[in-house]
A protein has these predicted regions:
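Active-site-proximal acidic secondary-structure segment that organizes catalysis
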Residues: 2-12, 123-126, 142-144, 148-205, ...
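Short, low-complexity Ser/Thr-rich regulatory SLiMs
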Residues: 98-100, 152-156, 416-420
Length: 473
């Protein structure tokens, strides 16, 4: 399966290390690049603002997403250099730098991507701890253009490749695309048959379309009304972790834990239960999250944020960049019946997915919280993401892993991941004593709920059968 973990859990082994970073000439070209009137995407803008404010406070915040995989044999450095540079030149998210001040964010863009060059540097033999430390500390910060680096660790009969990318230019889907891009290109080059890669789309064009779409909204637009309805419904109780995490203001240290929720047979049974209830896998996941929240809080309605991959079309689906954006889901608990909750969750999921195109910040640009009659969040948020890695099953042979830096924003991110042969949950959390205890307690409850949903009792089965009959009539 595709591994999800922290940089600290990554096991690249020990051996000679080679890294790829921007050449001095490329940095100079970017420093002299002309100003580009196109603002960053809304995802990038928020990330840049967070990085700017964190730098002023002397704090580190989560930012790095690393894809790593293994390749048999001895690395051909020249071929890997070509593969990495082709990847960077293919995806224009890497072609812009952002100058951030307290008042503005200005983009600068290189007009000829062929002038960008990443060059290899041999660092010699390094131990595993040294490698992890280097990868975490040597990638330039979010406010620097070249906040993405690559590397290889050579072993006796194989090597490990990594691409360590700031979130400014990547998301969960991008991690898989980066692996496919570089790995397929490299394999083609060493075999003497250059890979035929699919067409990509411009991330800059995505940002332009996003700006036009958002700025066209008014208080009478459906997305704005739907966001306001959700905010009013929460009544200040915005999506957050249901268990205490301790004092998260002292440190931004974070942890990541991954455990199995369902084995292969249970995953199939869970999917069948969702379908029989008139929902999909995503509706069942949200129903289970709602039941877990209810066990801790007793809340009658569960509110959550979940990300949507806003890529559209074949070319954009193959493009690296930060396309993922959050939208809200609300699930009434009722009497706790999984089938009913799955249908309600699916209905909310499908009805609100369009809100991923419009950030909630747009609502506040149009009116104040007082004018809208809403109460804003007072604690760090919680996200529940559903990811489907079945399409990456072939990457199992290369031990593909996605690794996050050991930092936390103070809230909780949860990824429910469907693999070819199991379902796992990964949670990133503030690394406090209370946080560690609470997260492990939460996961234990969540595992029990998923397992129970995969083995419905007779009453539940009767209810599903009745619904299925009525639905087919």
């Amino acid at each position: 399966m595709v591994t999800i973990g922290s940089h600290g859990s990554w096991q690249p082994g020990r051996g000679p290390m080679t890294t790829w970073t921007a050449s001095p000439a490329s940095r100079e070209i970017m420093a002299r690049a002309e100003s580009d009137p196109m603002p960053p995407s809304f995802q990038q803008e928020q990330h840049l603002r967070t990085a700017y404010n964190a730098k002023a406070l002397g704090r580190n915040v989560p930012r790095l997403i690393m894809a790593a995989w293994d390749v048999d044999g001895w690395c051909d450095v020249a071929a890997m250099t070509d593969a990495i540079n082709l990847h960077i030149r293919r995806h224009d998210t890497y072609h812009s730098a952002f100058d951030v001040t307290a008042d503005a964010i200005t983009r600068r863009t290189i007009d000829n991507a062929d002038r960008i060059e990443f060059i290899p540097t041999s660092l010699g033999f390094m131990e595993e701890d040294e490698i992890r430390h280097h990868v975490l500390t040597a990638t330039p910060g979010t406010l620097e253009w070249d906040c993405f680096t690559f590397g290889v660790i050579q072993k006796a009969d194989s090597f490990t490749v990594y691409a360590n990318i700031d979130h400014l230019h990547t998301d969960g889907t991008s991690a898989g695309l980066i692996y496919q891009d570089i790995h397929l290109t490299y394999q083609g080059l060493v075999a003497g048959r250059p890979a035929s890669l699919p067409q990509t789309s411009s991330y800059r064009d995505f940002a332009a379309h996003q700006r036009d779409q958002v700025e066209a909204t008014t208080l009478d637009s459906r997305p704005i009304k739907d966001w306001v309805d959700f905010a009013r419904e929460t009544d200040g109780d915005w999506p957050s972790f249901p268990v205490e995490l301790g004092d998260t203001s002292i440190s931004t240290a974070g942890g990541v834990v991954t455990v199995e929720l369902l084995n292969d047979d249970q995953t199939q049974a869970f999917n069948n239960a969702c379908r029989a209830a008139g929902a999909r896998f995503s509706g069942g996941v949200m129903a289970c999250a709602a039941l877990a929240d209810h066990q801790f809080t007793g809340a009658e309605t569960y509110h959550s944020f979940t990300p949507s991959d806003t890529r559209s079309g074949d070319a954009q689906s193959m493009s690296a960049g930060w396309y993922a954006s959050l939208f809200p889901v609300s699930v009434p608990v009722g009497d706790g019946d999984f089938a009913q909750m799955s249908r309600a969750a699916q209905k909310s999921f499908d009805a609100n997915k369009h809100l991923s195109a419009i950030p909630f910040r747009r609502v506040l640009d149009l009116a104040s919280p007082e004018e809208l009659g809403v109460t804003l969040a007072s604690q760090p948020s919680m996200m529940v993401s559903l990811m489907d890695f079945r399409a990456l099953a072939a990457a199992d042979a290369n031990h593909l892993g996605i690794y996050l830096d050991n930092l936390s924003h103070g809230g909780i991110n949860t990824w429910i991941i469907r693999h070819a042969d199991q379902t796992t949950v990964t949670v990133s959390f503030p690394d406090t004593a209370e946080g560690r205890h609470s997260v492990h307690n939460y996961i234990a409850v969540l595992r029990g709920i998923f397992a129970e949903a995969a083995e419905p009792n007779a009453d539940w089965a009767d209810e599903v059968a009745d619904h299925a009959f009525a639905h087919s009539a």
